[in-house]
Amino acid sequence: MAFDFARATKYFLMWDFIKGFGLGMRYFVSPKPTLNYPHEKGPLSPRFRGEHALRRYPNGEERCIACKLCEAVCPAQAITIDAERREDGSRRTTRYDIDMTKCIYCGFCQEACPVDAIVEGPNFEYATETREELFYDKQKLLANGERWEAEIARNLQLDAPYR
């Protein structure tokens, strides 16, 4: 039986233990990748799909032209739209509802909209206490659009070369 000097040296000097200890110490002193979530927020992609919003033109007029493409393309059938004609011949929505309990956040509504009226904004913190609060009507969607307009416009501008 031959004596294995390399194996004995490795065993005697506890080389594996030293390598493991060194690796542990390297991670112990390195900066932590974890965010303290409620107090720190990480970056979001411009393509992030969060809470829905209806946008307005800079003059205050609603962008939605009641084409109902978003309603037709929604695979979850979460969008309901009623529309009427105006005196000038254009159409506008009288009712625009989204059932957020059905929504799967696929983004098809945003992609189908020819005037960028319906968008999925950057807000992902909209937990509710009751189910009824997840039924968004036109006023709630317009309020979301007004609240997040600056960030929505920036995200759409950043994503424009890829659309």
Curated annotation (Swiss-Prot):
<comment type="similarity">
    <text>Belongs to the complex I 23 kDa subunit family.</text>
</comment>
<keyword id="KW-0408">Iron</keyword>
<feature type="binding site">
    <location>
        <position position="74"/>
    </location>
    <ligand>
        <name>[4Fe-4S] cluster 2</name>
    </ligand>
</feature>
<feature type="binding site">
    <location>
        <position position="67"/>
    </location>
    <ligand>
        <name>[4Fe-4S] cluster 1</name>
    </ligand>
</feature>
<keyword id="KW-1003">Cell membrane</keyword>
<feature type="binding site">
    <location>
        <position position="113"/>
    </location>
    <ligand>
        <name>[4Fe-4S] cluster 1</name>
    </ligand>
</feature>
<keyword id="KW-0997">Cell inner membrane</keyword>
<feature type="domain" description="4Fe-4S ferredoxin-type 2">
    <location>
        <begin position="94"/>
        <end position="123"/>
    </location>
</feature>
<keyword id="KW-0874">Quinone</keyword>
<protein>
    <recommendedName>
        <fullName>NADH-quinone oxidoreductase subunit 9</fullName>
        <ecNumber>7.1.1.-</ecNumber>
    </recommendedName>
</protein>
<dbReference type="Pfam" id="PF12838">
    <property type="entry name" value="Fer4_7"/>
</dbReference>
<feature type="binding site">
    <location>
        <position position="64"/>
    </location>
    <ligand>
        <name>[4Fe-4S] cluster 1</name>
    </ligand>
</feature>
<keyword id="KW-0830">Ubiquinone</keyword>
<dbReference type="InterPro" id="IPR010226">
    <property type="entry name" value="NADH_quinone_OxRdtase_chainI"/>
</dbReference>
<comment type="subunit">
    <text>NDH-1 is composed of at least 14 different subunits, Nqo1 to Nqo14. The complex has a L-shaped structure, with the hydrophobic arm (subunits Nqo7, Nqo8, Nqo10 to Nqo14) embedded in the inner membrane and the hydrophilic peripheral arm (subunits Nqo1 to Nqo6, Nqo9) protruding into the bacterial cytoplasm. The hydrophilic domain contains all the redox centers.</text>
</comment>
<dbReference type="GO" id="GO:0005506">
    <property type="term" value="F:iron ion binding"/>
</dbReference>
<dbReference type="GO" id="GO:0050136">
    <property type="term" value="F:NADH:ubiquinone reductase (non-electrogenic) activity"/>
</dbReference>
<dbReference type="GO" id="GO:0048038">
    <property type="term" value="F:quinone binding"/>
</dbReference>
<dbReference type="GO" id="GO:0009060">
    <property type="term" value="P:aerobic respiration"/>
</dbReference>
<keyword id="KW-0520">NAD</keyword>
<keyword id="KW-1278">Translocase</keyword>
<comment type="function">
    <text>NDH-1 shuttles electrons from NADH, via FMN and iron-sulfur (Fe-S) centers, to quinones in the respiratory chain. The immediate electron acceptor for the enzyme in this species is believed to be ubiquinone. Couples the redox reaction to proton translocation (for every two electrons transferred, four hydrogen ions are translocated across the cytoplasmic membrane), and thus conserves the redox energy in a proton gradient.</text>
</comment>
<keyword id="KW-0004">4Fe-4S</keyword>
<dbReference type="InterPro" id="IPR017900">
    <property type="entry name" value="4Fe4S_Fe_S_CS"/>
</dbReference>
<feature type="binding site">
    <location>
        <position position="109"/>
    </location>
    <ligand>
        <name>[4Fe-4S] cluster 2</name>
    </ligand>
</feature>
<dbReference type="GO" id="GO:0051539">
    <property type="term" value="F:4 iron, 4 sulfur cluster binding"/>
</dbReference>
<feature type="binding site">
    <location>
        <position position="70"/>
    </location>
    <ligand>
        <name>[4Fe-4S] cluster 1</name>
    </ligand>
</feature>
<feature type="binding site">
    <location>
        <position position="103"/>
    </location>
    <ligand>
        <name>[4Fe-4S] cluster 2</name>
    </ligand>
</feature>
<keyword id="KW-0411">Iron-sulfur</keyword>
<keyword id="KW-0479">Metal-binding</keyword>
<feature type="binding site">
    <location>
        <position position="106"/>
    </location>
    <ligand>
        <name>[4Fe-4S] cluster 2</name>
    </ligand>
</feature>
<keyword id="KW-0472">Membrane</keyword>
<dbReference type="GO" id="GO:0005886">
    <property type="term" value="C:plasma membrane"/>
</dbReference>
<dbReference type="InterPro" id="IPR017896">
    <property type="entry name" value="4Fe4S_Fe-S-bd"/>
</dbReference>
<keyword id="KW-0677">Repeat</keyword>
<feature type="domain" description="4Fe-4S ferredoxin-type 1">
    <location>
        <begin position="54"/>
        <end position="84"/>
    </location>
</feature>
